[in-house]
C-alpha cells in the first residue's frame, strides 16, 4: 500500500505497547490512530506520544476500542491470550484487520483465531523479527541436512517478567524442525530434564528455558553430533525489532483478503 496505514495499539501502557507507539511514530507509512489501555488504568487520558517518549501526539489513551472505531485500519495486539481473543472478536464485528504478537495461546484459542480469520485479515506470529523469521528458514535447511544424525536441543532466554514458557518462538523453532523431519512435536518434545532420565532418545527435541533479568529474547537451536555441533542463534537487543516487524505486517495486511497469515508471508519467505 502506498498511503499511510492507521494503526491502533492495545496494551499501550506496557513495555511492548510503548515501544509500538514509538515505532509507529518513526514509520513513514504508518500513522498512530488510537492507543488503548484497560478500563481503570491510571494512564487513561495520558498523551500516547508523551508516554512513549516521542513528544506530544494529541492522541490520548482511551479505555475502549469502541471510542476509536473510525480512527484506525489495523489493530496491533501484544497483550495476553484471553484479551487478544476478545479484541479479535471486536475486529471481526467492526471489519478491522489485526496483527497478533501475543503468545501462549492454548489449542482452543488457536481454533477460535482460525475461525475469526475466515472473516477478517489476521497476521499472527510468535515473533515479528525479520532475523527470527530468516532463522526459521535456516532451521529447515539444517534439519534437512543434519536432523536425522544429531541430537537437537532448543535453548531460549527471556526477561523475568515473561509469563509463558517455552516461548512461542522456541515452540515455533521446534515445529519447523519437527515438520521438516516428519516428526510430531507433541510426541517428541522434552521440556526440561531432571533426575535419572536415562540415555537420550535421538528422536526427541529438547527444550530448555531461562528467565532472568532484562533479557529481551535469545534463542538457540543446537544440532549436536559426536565431534561437532551446529548452533543457530538469534539474539534480540531491543523490543524495537519486534515493533518494527509488527508495523511492517500492518502495512502489508491492510490489502489482504480475510485469512490467517504469518510473518513468513509478510516477508515473502514462503
UniProtKB/Swiss-Prot annotation:
Catalytic function, reaction form: (S)-2,3,4,5-tetrahydrodipicolinate + NAD(+) + H2O = (2S,4S)-4-hydroxy-2,3,4,5-tetrahydrodipicolinate + NADH + H(+); (S)-2,3,4,5-tetrahydrodipicolinate + NADP(+) + H2O = (2S,4S)-4-hydroxy-2,3,4,5-tetrahydrodipicolinate + NADPH + H(+)
Pathway: Amino-acid biosynthesis; L-lysine biosynthesis via DAP pathway; (S)-tetrahydrodipicolinate from L-aspartate: step 4/4
Binding site residues for NAD(+): 11-16, 37, 101-103, 125-128
Compartment(s) of residence: Cytoplasm
Keywords: Amino-acid biosynthesis, Cytoplasm, Diaminopimelate biosynthesis, Lysine biosynthesis, NAD, NADP, Oxidoreductase
Uppermost EC category: oxidoreductase
Family assignment from sequence similarity: Belongs to the DapB family.
Role played: Catalyzes the conversion of 4-hydroxy-tetrahydrodipicolinate (HTPA) to tetrahydrodipicolinate.
Record protein name field: 4-hydroxy-tetrahydrodipicolinate reductase
Organism: Shewanella oneidensis (strain ATCC 700550 / JCM 31522 / CIP 106686 / LMG 19005 / NCIMB 14063 / MR-1)
Gene: dapB
